[in-house]
Each structure stands twice: as structure tokens, then as C-alpha cells.
Amino acid sequence: MSEWKLSIGTAGAVGARQLKIDALPTTAYVMLGEHCMRNCAFCAQARDSTSQSKFLSRVAWEETPEAEAIRNIGLAFQAGKIKRACLQVVNTPDSHALVIRALDEFKKYGELPVVVSSHFTTVEQAAELFDKGAARLGLALDVATPELFASIKGGSWQNRWELLCACAERFPGRMTTHLIVGLGETEKEMWQVICECYKRQITVGLFAFTPLKGTKFADRQPPDRGSYRRLQIGLELLKKGYEATVVEFEGESITKINVPAVWEVLADGHAFRTTGCEDCNRPYYNEKPRDVLYNYHRPLTAEELELAFAESGVTGC
């Protein structure tokens, strides 16, 4: 049996280690494989990265024997400690086979929902993963424009987008993608992609770019938090049933939200919480615990909510 990697938070959530943390993950995060065949400029697992192989984003991952990891996750689900499992699959020659085996093993634990975030290349491969028991599939765009995709990730954004759309049409409401803010796109470019995803029932997990030692982008800065807040607000308003046109621009920047009493509409703070698949909270995935959070993994305090509104800098009507 192979070694799996559990995020440190997951190891705490399933009882494999003791952690002092204000909130444990509600999803069990598993990394399958290491040393990716791709060469994304922001990723610790990239082909040319010199980062330690135990990292993905700023999270450390702990090697665990496969059988032990499956048992701990399954029992934690049965005990109500986690809501689902998420397989973060590194693109390697045997990655598809690893996922198929993992899905087969998780079936031993009944109704445990398993999300697979991987690099399948055809609708038929996606169908096989669903047939094997995946609850949802994630196919990461990461980057908002074809030009940036080619320079940062390599390959064709259009091909990835067309595959994502084809899967969303065949498996409506069961597809997720990740988008990373701060890779050189404008707010308008990111907003356009978010809206196109939402129209197709593709769930968006919004991330803030995180510079990592050993990657090509190690010296780049994280995104402006105000820009990130504005995109979070727009995404939340889509979820609440508002039209995309309520988000207004001057040039490439969001400057106004055309919603009466918009701050009352957003008073629940959900706009600034972690986005993506249901029950995914990703504690401290984008920032250190002492930093102001891009994505809050828990309800915001009144002070945090006030700060997030102020950071956005937008006006309502």
C-alpha cells in the first residue's frame, strides 16, 4: 500500500495528531502523489519547484500509510468529525489509477462523500470517476485568461475550459473549479470567468495567490485584499440571486455594487468565508494564523466583518 499525505489540519481532525488550532477542517484533505509533471509557476509541487515536497500552498502535508489514512478518515466521518473527503491529486503518470483505487477503498465507509480534484483530460475519464463513487469533481482553471494560463501553467486555457463546460453539461451541479486571484489578471477578467462558471452551475473555489519559497513566483506579492473582497462580494451576490450586472466597473476595477442596502444583504458575512465545495473550510490555506484572512474558515466577528467591508472600498446604492 502506498503513502498518502494528509494535511496537518486533517491529521488533527481525524485524531492522528494533537493540534492547538482555533478551527479544524470540516473536510479531510488528502494529497495523492508528488512531483507533478506540470510546471505551474505558483505551485510547490511543480516540476521545477525546489520547495519541500510536503507542501501544497502554504499547508504542510503528513505522510500516512494508505490503509491507516482511509480508516482514520472513514471513522472520523462516521463519528461526525468531518463531512467529506477531498482528494488533491498531483498530476503523475499513475494518478488516475491512484484515484480509482482510493474511491474503491472509501466505499467501505458507506456514504462518505468524496470530492476529486484532479487532471482528467476527457469527459469519459470524468464519467469513470463518478461511476466509481466521486460525489463531485474539480478541474482547476486557476488562471483567468488564456494568455496568463499559457505563461503560468503551460498549455491551453481554452481546452481546459471546454472540458470543464462539457463536464458541467453532462454532470450538472457536480463540477467545481478553482480560481486564484493575484496572478496578473484584472478584476474584470476574473469577474467574467466567475460569471461564466456560475451560469453553467460550476462551483467556484476562490483562492488568493500565496507566494511560496522554491517556486517561480516566490517573490511575487499576494493580491490586494480590497480587490479580493470585491470579487468575494460579487460571487456572494450571484449566490443570493442577483444579476451579474449589479457589479459595476470603472475601467478594469469594481467600483460600485448596485444593490440597495448592500451591506445589510451581506451582513451574514458569508461573502468573506471560504468558497468552493460544500463543507470545505480550508483553515489558513492562504495566510498565516496571525494575518488578516482572505478566506475566513469560521463565522466573522463584528470587527472582522466591518474591516472586510471597509477593505472592499465599494459603494452601494
Residue ranges and their predicted role:
Residues L24-H35, E248-T275:
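Immediate flanking context of iron-sulfur cluster ligation sites
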Residues T122-K132, V181-R200:
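Catalytic cores of alpha/beta
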Residues M1-E63, N72-L75, A271, P283-Y285:
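N-terminal [4Fe-4S]-dependent radical SAM core
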Residues M1-T10, A261-C317:
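Radical SAM enzyme core and accessory elements
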Residues E147-K153, G184-E185, T203-Y228, G241-E264:
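Flexible glycine/acidic-rich beta-alpha junction loops that bind and position SAM and/or redox cofactors
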Residues A97-V114, S156-R174, D224-A244:
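Alpha-helix-loop-beta-strand connector modules within alpha/beta enzyme cores
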Residues L164-K188, A208-F209, G214:
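Conserved strand-turn element in the central/C-terminal portion of the radical SAM core barrel
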Residues R47-H96, K107-Q125, A134-E162, T176, ...:
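Core AdoMet radical
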